Amino acid sequence: DSEGVRYEEPKLKMMGIEAVKSSTPAPCRTMIKDGLKIMMNGTEEEVIDYIDNCRTKFKALPPEEIAFPRTVSNVKKYHSRTDIYSKGTPIHARGALLFNYYIKKNKLDKKYSLISNGEKIKFIYLKKPNIIQENVVSFIQDFPRELNLDKYIDYDLQFEKSFLEPLKAILDAIGWNVEKTVNLELFFT
């Protein structure tokens, strides 16, 4: 029921969780919502299988779809004269400053606009070591493949932060695991 109106299929009202936050990548929002439905109607085993399937699908998605959307402000404030960014720079702003630096350095500023204050951007985690020796890069709409960073995208960390952590908070509360666990009892049964 919703204020006296009965729905064919019960509607789940979600507030404050990653399934509805605009700062969560869109495919993850859908996967989290579906995961919550399985949690309410299925078994722990079904949830674990669902998470494994989501991990496989996630790793096949392009960077533009799995990156975290944010609005960046104070890009100039965090710029450093000696380094690319100053200490304490938020991760998405650090990614923006790195993007601007490497786009200029590689003379790609005709193809990609530089990121400025108030811009809607996306940021993605990178594995280290990599060619820029940083763990993040931001971009506006299209991932800059010319920087050759595609092979360094940390799909595992992206999946962990955008999908697994939000689900794990709920699974922990109900005492379920996110993956199959082996315990000693299995050896004695």
Segments from the language model and where they lie:
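DNA-dependent DNA polymerase catalytic subunits
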Residues: 1-189
